């Protein structure tokens, strides 16, 4: 379970970084899932 959670967090971070790099607004649901 921990490995799956780490992969999920890593994927979310990568998605957020890509969105910021492209200058796109960050999806609120992505932020919510990061916060728990």
Curated annotation (Swiss-Prot):
Keywords, in A-Z order: Amidation, Secreted, Signal
The keyword 4Fe-4S is assigned to this record: no
Tissue specificity comment: Expressed by the venom gland.
Pro-sequence residue ranges: 24-25
Superkingdom assignment: Eukaryota
Location of this chain's protein in the cell: Secreted
Signal peptide, first to last residue: 1-23
Keyword set includes Transmembrane: no
GO cellular component assignments: extracellular region
Modified residues (Glutamine amide): 35
Major localisation: secreted
Functional summary from the UniProt entry: Venom protein with unknown function. Does not induce paralysis when a high dose is administered by intrathoracic injection into the blowfly Lucilia caesar.
Name of protein: U14-myrmicitoxin-Tb1a
Lineage of producing organism: Eukaryota, Metazoa, Ecdysozoa, Arthropoda, Hexapoda
């Amino acid at each position: 379970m921990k490995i799956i959670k780490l992969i999920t967090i890593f994927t979310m971070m990568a998605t957020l970084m890509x969105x910021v790099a492209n200058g796109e607004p960050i999806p609120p649901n992505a932020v919510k899932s990061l916060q728990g």
